[in-house]
Amino acid sequence: MTPYLHFVSELARLVRQGRQFPLGGFAPPSRPVIAADAPRALIFSPHPDDECIIGGLALRLQREAGLRVVNVAVTQGSNKARQAARWDELTAACDYLGFDLVATVPGGLEHVNVRTRAADPAHWSASVEVIARLLGEHRPATIFFPHDADWNSSHIGTHHLLVDALARQAPAFTCRVVETEFWGAMATPNLMVESSIDDVAEMMTALSFHVGEVQRNPYHLLVPAWMQDNVRRGGELVGGQGGAAPDFNFCTLYRLREWRDGALHFVHDGGRALPASVNVREILPVATRP
């Protein structure tokens, strides 16, 4: 038997073992107190659970830079029979991560997709106004939302919802914009953020609170593999073709830009890698502005 067969066998064994782990119900770990007037990072999650999957950078902004992370539940899923339960699961997951939670409207926004944007401008405009109001109320330093080719219709719809809502802000409004990926990989990420083993375990644990979803499909157990593949992709997509890959175990890929003067602008040339050993303030100093 080669060592690689043993390696793959152990991976399969661990995933099988993970299917027996408890789902949710874990006590939140202790965290530093976030100042009441701390700068805010808003995660605009197309579905309950996205905050746990793409939240590696948000978790580090909370811990290393003292930002208050607020998860905005753009929708609560399309299954109306599950929406109340999904809100309860989301509340528990955010509580575990130390994220605040904000609703858009009772039950979440509906029909967040490009078809609605094109065919029902009145409905779309009302949804955009909900998001625009939240941006104005929270005045975030940083916002997270999916990139424009993230495959899932609600993810792509959320991208356009945010861009349209940003366009409704006052001319002086500015914030860092972090585009995320999950269903569809970005062709041009420019930031790879390492997560420590502890952080990955916390995100997996939080994801397990979404009991109804992971019982149906235990995708929470595959998050580490996804984050390992991000290291492979990011080594060249962010670091440059043919370049040396960073010595990361797990990472998340993002596209970092800034909204200012009514448009999105890149904030640095090329790609950046943020190791777990380097404080996020050294890479994203503007993200911590008051």
Predicted regions and their residues:
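Glycine-rich, flexible loop segments associated with nucleotide phosphate handling
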Residues: 124-127, 176, 245-250
